[in-house]
């Protein structure tokens, strides 16, 4: 069973359908007992960082996620950004699960970064075109396992311990997106 954290901001239905299409049972929850029973936890998200953190703190999700060390915790789009320490969007602290910060995209290309872009990585699964929609990005770091070139390097997939971030929308990225999501649900792209 996969637990999708429902904190009130997210593309829950599309992510749910994608995970079910992969053959997993899904539960939408904010309940610690459900999360503890799950094989993996997914934190989806669209919208504003500050609003998302307010909702997460209101529902006591932050401490629950900080105590998960034995299974994948996957953030998608805004969910990936929430995993980090701080965001310039609203100048607010994140979940502080992954070292680093979220900053505005600095590119000569149009913002938001919208549409298909190729991932670059040494991991063979992470070398495909995927669908992005965002104006903020994680800073480049040693935790980036795939990035896209958009006039600057845009982290597309990060992994730090059991925390995996996917900046693009795997549920909107066709077969490759589903394969990437499935690999994340199984534990990610690096071996510790």
UniProtKB/Swiss-Prot annotation:
The active site is at 77 (nucleophile), 169, 171. GO terms for biological process: L-histidine biosynthetic process. Disulfide bonds: none annotated. One of its GO terms (molecular function) is glutaminase activity. Pfam families: GATase. Its main location: cytoplasm. Residues 1-192 form the Glutamine amidotransferase type-1 domain. CDD domains: GATase1_IGP_Synthase. This is Imidazole glycerol phosphate synthase subunit HisH. It comes from Staphylococcus epidermidis (strain ATCC 12228 / FDA PCI 1200). The gene is hisH.
């Amino acid at each position: 069973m996969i637990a999708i954290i429902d904190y009130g901001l997210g593309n829950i239905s599309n992510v749910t359908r994608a995970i079910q299409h992969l053959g997993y049972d899904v539960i939408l929850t904010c309940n610690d007992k459900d999360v503890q029973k799950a094989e993996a936890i997914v934190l989806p998200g669209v919208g504003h960082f500050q609003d998302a953190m307010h909702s997460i703190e209101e529902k006591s999700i932050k401490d629950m996620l900080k105590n998960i060390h034995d299974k994948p915790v996957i953030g998608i789009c805004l969910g990936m950004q929430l995993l980090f320490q701080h965001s310039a969007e609203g100048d607010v602290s994140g979940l502080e699960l992954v070292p680093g910060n979220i900053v505005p995209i600095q590119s000569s290309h149009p913002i938001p970064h919208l549409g298909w872009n190729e991932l670059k990585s040494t991991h063979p699964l992470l070398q495909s075109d995927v669908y992005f929609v965002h104006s903020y990005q994680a800073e480049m770091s040693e935790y980036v396992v795939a990035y896209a070139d958009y006039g600057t390097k845009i982290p597309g997939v990060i992994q730090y311990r059991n925390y995996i971030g996917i900046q693009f929308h795997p549920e909107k990225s066709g077969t490759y997106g589903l394969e990437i999501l499935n690999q994340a649900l199984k534990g990610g792209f690096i071996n510790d």
